[in-house]
């Protein structure tokens, strides 16, 4: 292949590194209304009264909107970017009289500049009726205090939700008699694991600009992964026709799932629709920490049974998930905790997976890279590592005996066949990369420091089966260059480049001959959005099919112009050539074909293709960590992280490697330092990046990523996804390495130096 599987530079690389104006705040006017939100200081309260008189006297103030400006009995909406009908419940109003977490919206203020809005915000007088909050997600289900007591709460999908029980979702599934199988096992690991809420901490905070266009429509320019879903969300929130809303996306300064929720779009949209004036909201870092959409906190009870020979016979998993004050992504994230962990163990005779997602008076959770699989894999992989310890087996060996293989039906994966899998090769590759046999389990450095290794494996999906939709439009322009139109959102992942590579490979042209335009609801073909590891696999396949269709049209018009049948010609990317018949050898250039198509022609040199997949082939990953632990202080130094990934055919190895390295770094942070915590009143404790500790470059050591390619027949040129699976292995790998160093296994993240030092002290 000449373009696909080549390490080409991102199309927008130079513009980004040279600081060109490409982001929301760069490309939108400065002379617009500044929008800010007055937020609740209480975790659960009713606004008894609100007085904005003094605030509105501040020079420059345009408007202040409160719950009195919103129909409290109107239909609610969800901010979750999901295909309609969304699994997430309709539980929000633009401004609700009932505030449900510290940071919930009490009023929307709009003024000429930030200074006047800040001054006005201090003058708004609010009287609250403070209610008892639900802060412990263990006691939320069937708690007498209801987070959503309202009658207009609504669940559109059959996910087991019941607002009268504080249940956002409930599910049960399984196969075989799990209790009988576990009773017959030689060893049963029975443990409870806890993973914390974590922030995506993207560099660009949430932000949106809105204006009324020439036709009286609401034009939204937002940093979002989901332009089409945002159109529906805003229309639902404002109770206006979707035809009155247009959403576009400039470059995005990071998303990682956070911008799969319309966190910021609704508020300036409300202001602009009401005032008919342009407006903009830019979340501060504090707001992005206390009122965003972090990873769901989860607790997983795992029972894993095996024989003495190490064969895993059954897995029983119950997941309790904390969705916070609103249900965005709650019903769907929890499913991945089981359906993206249990299937790794293909020998299992039985499984059971049950889950509850509960409302609490914490910040609403949302989507974050890994989307529930991260949490479940920490639990299941940690249980397998403990099983290996008990049986005296090597963790690599026990996995080699149990993993799913190509051609097998995967347990707990909806009956899907494993159509492409190099997991066995990934295990062997990482085993050698980390020099496992010489380092496992640990080495005493005789200076108060111990070096140890640990490992874990992971899977994810490639889009959502029979739901995610990707589309592409390709057209030939004069001189024979192409325009590729997509609805997917490049949020730094490089899909504007990789999708163009797919098209260029089919059309046999240089990458520079394809101009990519993306993510505008008015002219982009429909795309569900950039999430669920779907862009390369789903939209990429649409692009491949679209390019093939356009190639056929080029040949058809070329044949017509050459006076022969389409079956007689070939196309090499530059010209159409007659291969047989009386005109054999005659050619016409693509440039001439393009020019001819614009004069007296009825063959359109444009194609649009939409694609959805009935399967979601998993990418796989194995990771191993080498750490050094200071037994006196508990400090963990990550020396080396070795990983092997099976993502099918990497479309762009450079971008694929960067995806993997970035995901591993985020997994390191979740394992060792990052956590969203609250005090006993529901106040978030980490409201800046000083308190919320993401790993810096010096904290992540050496990261090495290699690829073991399988070939996925349903993907473009054999490709599967890469974006999410890469965050999942550091959690079990590093935690297992810590156990091997200090002799104590940790079941709750993050594993801080304090916890490790105490464990080392207890061991002494």
For every predicted segment, state its role.
Residues 6, 12-15, 82-85, 161-208, ...:
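Glycine-rich loop/linker segments at domain edges
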Residues 462-524, 539:
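Catalytic phosphate/nucleotide-handling subdomain of diverse soluble enzymes
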Residues 85, 97-98, 241-244, 248-249, ...:
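Conserved catalytic cysteine-centered active-site region
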Residues 67-68, 239-244, 274-279, 308, ...:
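C-terminal catalytic domains of large/alpha subunits in multi-subunit enzymes
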Residues 74-79, 120-123, 231-233, 256-262, ...:
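Short acidic, glycine/serine/threonine-rich loops at helix termini
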Residues 1-160, 188:
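Flexible, low-hydrophobicity surface segments
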Residues 147-238, 403-481, 623, 685-706:
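Helix-loop-helix junctions that connect adjacent transmembrane helices in secondary transporters/permeases
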Residues 232, 253-276, 280-283, 495-503:
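Thiamine diphosphate
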């Amino acid at each position: 292949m000449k373009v696909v599987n080549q390490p080409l530079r991102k199309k927008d690389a130079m513009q980004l590194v040279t600081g060109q104006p490409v982001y929301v705040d760069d490309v939108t006017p400065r002379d617009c209304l500044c929008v800010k939100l007055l937020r609740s200081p209480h975790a659960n309260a009713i606004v008894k009264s609100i007085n904005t008189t003094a605030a509105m006297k501040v020079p420059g103030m345009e408007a202040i909107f409160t719950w009195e400006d919103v129909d409290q009995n109107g239909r609610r909406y969800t901010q979750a970017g999901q295909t309609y009908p969304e699994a997430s419940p309709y539980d929000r109003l633009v401004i609700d009289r009932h505030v449900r977490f510290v940071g919930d919206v009490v009023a929307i203020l709009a003024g000429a500049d930030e200074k006047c809005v800040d001054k006005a915000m201090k003058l708004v007088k609010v009287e609250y009726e403070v209610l008892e909050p639900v802060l412990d997600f263990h006691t939320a289900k069937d708690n007498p205090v209801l987070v959503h007591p309202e009658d207009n709460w609504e669940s559109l999908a059959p996910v087991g939700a019941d607002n009268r029980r504080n249940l956002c979702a409930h599910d049960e599934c399984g196969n075989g008699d799990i209790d009988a199988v576990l009773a017959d096992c030689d060893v049963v690991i029975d443990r409870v694991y806890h993973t914390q809420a974590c922030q995506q901490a993207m560099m660009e905070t949430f932000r949106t600009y809105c204006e009324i266009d020439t036709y009286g429509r609401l034009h939204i320019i937002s940093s979002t992964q989901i332009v089409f879903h945002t159109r529906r969300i805003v229309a639902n929130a404002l109770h206006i026709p979707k035809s009155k809303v247009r959403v576009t996306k400039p470059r995005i300064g990071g998303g990682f799932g956070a911008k799969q929720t319309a966190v910021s779009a609704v508020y300036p949209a409300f202001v602009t629709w009401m005032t008919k004036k342009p407006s903009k909201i830019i979340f501060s870092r504090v707001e992005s920490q206390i009122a965003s959409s972090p990873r769901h906190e989860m607790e997983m009870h795992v029972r894993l049974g095996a024989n003495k020979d190490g064969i895993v016979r059954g897995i029983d998993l119950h997941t309790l998930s904390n969705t916070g004050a609103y249900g965005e992504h709650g019903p769907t994230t929890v499913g991945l905790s089981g359906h993206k962990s249990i299937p790794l163990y293909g020998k299992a005779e039985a499984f059971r997976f049950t889950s509850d997602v509960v409302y609490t008076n914490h910040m609403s959770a949302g989507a974050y890279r890994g989307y529930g699989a991260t949490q479940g894999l920490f639990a299941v992989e940690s249980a397998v590592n403990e099983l290996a310890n008990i049986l005296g087996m090597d963790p690599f060996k026990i996995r080699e005996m149990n993993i799913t293989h190509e051609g097998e039906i995967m347990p707990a994966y909806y009956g899907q066949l494993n159509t492409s899998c190099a997991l066995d090769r990934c295990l062997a590759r990482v085993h050698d990369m980390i020099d496992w046999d010489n380092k496992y389990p640990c080495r005493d450095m005789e200076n108060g420091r111990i070096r140890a290794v640990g490992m874990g494996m992971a899977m994810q999906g490639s889009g959502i089966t029979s739901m995610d939709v990707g589309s592409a439009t390709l057209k030939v322009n004069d001189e024979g260059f192409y325009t590729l139109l997509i609805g997917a959102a490049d949020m730094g992942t490089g899909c504007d480049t990789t999708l163009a590579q797919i098209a260029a490979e089919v059309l046999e042209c240089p990458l520079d001959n394809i101009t990519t335009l993306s993510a505008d609801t008015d002219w982009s073909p429909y795309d569900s959005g950039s999430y669920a590891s779907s862009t390369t696999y789903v939209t990429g396949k649409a692009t491949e099919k679209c390019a093939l269709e356009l190639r056929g049209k080029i040949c058809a018009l070329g044949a017509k112009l050459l006076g022969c049948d389409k079956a007689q010609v070939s196309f090499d990317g530059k010209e159409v050539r007659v291969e047989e018949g009386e005109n054999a050898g005659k050619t016409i250039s693509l440039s001439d074909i393009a020019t001819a198509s614009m004069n007296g022609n009825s063959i359109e040199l444009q194609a649009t293709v939409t694609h959805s997949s009935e399967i979601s082939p998993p990418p796989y990953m194995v990771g191993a960590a080498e750490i050094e632990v200071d037994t006196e202080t508990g400090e963990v130094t990550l020396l080396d992280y070795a990983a092997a990934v099976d993502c099918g055919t990497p479309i762009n190895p450079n971008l694929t490697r960067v995806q993997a390295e970035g995901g591993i770094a985020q997994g390191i942070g979740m394992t060792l330092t990052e956590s969203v915590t609250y005090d006993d009143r529901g106040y978030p404790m980490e409201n800046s990046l000083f308190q919320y500790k993401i790993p810096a470059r010096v904290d992540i050591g050496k990261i090495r990523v290699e690829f073991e390619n399988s070939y996925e027949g349903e993907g473009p040129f054999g490709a599967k996804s890469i974006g999410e699976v890469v965050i999942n292995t550091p959690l079990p790998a590093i935690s297992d390495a810590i156990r091997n160093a200090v002799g104590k296994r940790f079941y709750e993240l993050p594993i801080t130096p304090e916890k490790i030092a105490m464990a080392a002290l207890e061991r002494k």
